[in-house]
UniProtKB/Swiss-Prot annotation:
This is Staphylopine synthase. It holds the Pfam family Staph_opine_DH. The lineage of its organism: Bacteria, Bacillati, Bacillota, Bacilli, Bacillales. The active site is at residue 216. The gene is cntM. NADP(+) binds at residues 9-12, 33, 37-40, 99.
C-alpha cells in the first residue's frame, strides 16, 4: 500500500484526508506543528482523545464529501516524520512550503515521487520543484489553482470536526509531467466528486487561475484598508463595499487594472495564456445578473480601452454589493453580500501580535510576483507600490508599539530562501521567450 503524507492539520487538510480515505487506497499520515501553534496542538490533543476526524456538509448536494474517519498516524511536528512516502500533499499555506519541506528527513525527501500543492501561489511550483530536485531528478509537482471549497472549524474546542460550507464551481490543475498518471487519477476522482476540474499544460498555468492574486493586493494594500487593519476604525468598515463604507474607489479599480496588466506581461514571458479578469470574476467566482453586464463586454474585456475596463470592473463590484440572486425581504432588501469586515491585527494565545492572513499571505504572494518580474526584467511599478505601502504600515506599527511582542510577519526581509529557489529555477530552466 502506498503512503501519503498530508502536511497540515487544519480544516482543508481534514477534508482532503477524508476524500483520500474514501476514494483511494493510500495509507494516510498527517503532520501539524503542535510545538509552535496552539491551534495545531489543540487538534493533536482532540484527535488523540477521540481517535477520529469528522467532516460535515452544509449543502446536501455535497454529501459525498462528508464522513468520519481515522488515519494511520498523526505526527506532532514535521521533524518527527519518519519513513518513506510516495506522495506529499501540501495542505498548508504557500508561504510555508519551503520551510516545511526542508524540515523533512533525507530518507523521506528521497522517497517522494509526487508533491501536490493545494493552495499555491504564482511561482510555488518553481520553489518546490527546485528544492526537491536535490533529492529526486524526476519529481512530479502538481499545482491546483486553489482549494476545492470552503471548510471551517465550527467549535474551536473540537477542531477535529469540520464543516464544508461550499464547493468551487471550477478548479484548474497542472503537472510538471505530461501524460501524468497521477493527474488522470485525480481527474477521475474529481468526476466522482462532481467537481469541475480542467487540466492545463503546466503548474504555473494553474497557479494563475486564482482571482485572489489580482484582487487582494488592491483591496488590502491601499491606505484605507491598511489603516483599518493596523490602526482600527471608529465604526466598522467592509472589504467589498464602496467608499466610505469600504475601500472601493475608481483609484482602487485603476490600481487593480494596472496590477493585472503587469501580471499579464509576466504571463506572456512564460507563454502562459492570459486571464480575462472580468470573465474570471463573473463566470467562475461570483456571478452577476445578465442585465448588469453585456456578454460582449465580458468576452472582449482584454482588448477594451483602459477606461472602459475600469468602468466594467467598478460596475461588477457595485453589482455584488448585495447578492443579486438572493430573495428580497418584505422591505425589498437583498442579502448584504459585501458586508465582510476587515480583520485587525490581533494577539494570539501566546500574546504575540499577528497580522491577519489577509493581507499577510497576500504580501507573500505579491512579493513573489515582484521577484519573478524582476528576474524577467519586467517592470512592476504598481506591484512595487502595493508592497511599499504594506511594508510602511508594518514599520509604523513596530515604531508605535515597541512594548509589544510582534510576530515575524512584521519583518520585511522575509522569503529570501523562496526567492533564491525561484532565481535558481529560472536560471536553469530557460523556458522564456
Amino acid at each position: 500500500m502506498s503512503k501519503l503524507l498530508m502536511i497540515g492539520t487544519g480544516p482543508v487538510a481534514i477534508q482532503l484526508a477524508n476524500i483520500c480515505y474514501l476514494k483511494s487506497d493510500y495509507e494516510i499520515d498527517m503532520v501539524g506543528r503542535a510545538s509552535t501553534s496552539e491551534k495545531s496542538k489543540r487538534l493533536y490533543q482532540a484527535y488523540k482523545k477521540e481517535k477520529q476526524f469528522e467532516v460535515k456538509i452544509q449543502n446536501e448536494a455535497h454529501q459525498h464529501l462528508e464522513g468520519k474517519f481515522e488515519i494511520n498516524r498523526l505526527y506532532k511536528d514535521v521533524k518527527n516524520v519518519k519513513g518513506e512516502y510516495e506522495t506529499v500533499v501540501m495542505a498548508c499555506t504557500a508561504d510555508a512550503y519551503y520551510d516545511t519541506l526542508q524540515q523533512l528527513s533525507l530518507e523521506t525527501l528521497q522517497s517522494v515521487k509526487h508533491v501536490i500543492l493545494i493552495s499555491p501561489t504564482f511561482g510555488s511550483q518553481m520553489i518546490v520543484e527546485q528544492f526537491m530536485s536535490k533529492f529526486s531528478q524526476d519529481i512530479e509537482v502538481i499545482s491546483f489553482s486553489t482549494y476545492l471549497g470552503d471548510t471551517r472549524i465550527v467549535d474551536k474546542e473540537a477542531p477535529n470536526h469540520v464543516l464544508t460550507t461550499g464547493v468551487k464551481k471550477k478548479l484548474y490543475m497542472g503537472s510538471t509531467h505530461s501524460n501524468s498518471t497521477m493527474c488522470q487519477r485525480i481527474s477521475a476522482l474529481a468526476e466522482q466528486l462532481k467537481i469541475q476540474l480542467e487540466v492545463v499544460e503546466s503548474p504555473l498555468h494553474a497557479e494563475t487561475r486564482n482571482s485572489s492574486l489580482y484582487v487582494h493586493p488592491p483591496l488590502f494594500m491601499n491606505d484605507f484598508s491598511l489603516k483599518a487593519i493596523f490602526e482600527g476604525t471608529d465604526v466598522p468598515v467592509y472589504v467589498y463595499k464602496l467608499f466610505p463604507e469600504g475601500p472601493i474607489t475608481m483609484t482602487l479599480i485603476r490600481e487593480m487594472r494596472l496590477m493585472w496588466k503587469e501580471m499579464m506581461a509576466i504571463l506572456q514571458a512564460f507563454r502562459v495564456p492570459s486571464v480575462n479578469l472580468l470573465q474570471f470574476m463573473v463566470k467562475e467566482n461570483y456571478p452577476v445578473r445578465p442585465e448588469t453586464l453585456d456578454e460582449g463586454d465580458i468576452e472582449h474585456f482584454e482588448i477594451l480601452p483602459d477606461i472602459l475596463q475600469e468602468y466594467l470592473l467598478y460596475v461588477r463590484y457595485t453589482a455584488i454589493l448585495i447578492d443579486p440572486f438572493s430573495q428580497p425581504d418584505e422591505n425589498g432588501h437583498y442579502f448584504d453580500f459585501s458586508a465582510v469586515p476587515f480583520k485587525q491585527v490581533y494577539k494570539n494565545e501566546q500574546d504575540v501580535v499577528q497580522i491577519p492572513r489577509m493581507p499577510s499571505e497576500d504580501y507573500y504572494r505579491t512579493a513573489m510576483i515582484q521577484h519573478i518580474g524582476k528576474m524577467l526584467g519586467i517592470k512592476t511599478p504598481m506591484i512595487d507600490q502595493f508592497l511599499t505601502r504594506y511594508e510602511a504600515s508594518c514599520q509604523a506599527y513596530k515604531d508605535m508599539h515597541q512594548d509589544q511582542q510582534l510576530s515575524s510577519q512584521f519583518n520585511t526581509n522575509l522569503f529570501e530562501g523562496d526567492k533564491a529557489l525561484v532565481t535558481k529555477f529560472l536560471e536553469i530552466n530557460r523556458t522564456l521567450s
